[in-house]
């Protein structure tokens, strides 16, 4: 007869990736395991909402590429309309990201993680970004999802690029409590100039659902008085096939060029609304930063802003 087992109660979240019972070392599978493919697509709307001093919103349909940096040759053989390192209808070039110092992107990214104290122990690095379309690309933000060998998310790198082609990577190790069943919550102080209408004394609050069947990216930018700007992307995963690429490029032709044009068009609209211009300070001396999480400013206002933004996005998406 087997001994009776005492009621163990609820499992404890240990490090944001694994759950274990009190007094036990056994671990359940990690939260949000990454897709197994070398590359896939995420399709959906991106929305920006300026909250003050003037209200301003826009929404565009886009598609992003999720690619395994250790499996670039395999990804490049997936379909005829997609290539790695050479021109095609849709393509990916390593030099469009990271420090672009001639090394393999995965190598330089692992070094950046090591400098932040993150060792993936043979795990994977998946990059979510806009690909080149007919040779042109621009990525306002690209995210590196960094997993250990067990598939647990250990860090995210938020790579921000402005229209001056200045680039900075915010390296964010996943700390205890940041990753839960609701997703990932992180924050960082703003270091690099991005917009002529946004001051530098600001904080980014990242609320993410890591890539799986879906991906959700939500960024709330706040100044000392409260939320100023939100940006969201809600993507559904699609296979990287010739048919999917052909349909997406037909539906959103010259997508990456339109992203750059849209940034300047929306900036003109903000200027016409009377927003003051902000001086452009020098770019950060370092290509990446691993500062501590930024302060959570005006949490109640942030929650209200997220509810309003999310409700608006859902209404637009359902139309």
Q: What kind of feature is each model-predicted range?
A:
Residues 2-3, 18-319:
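Mature, function-bearing regions of proteins
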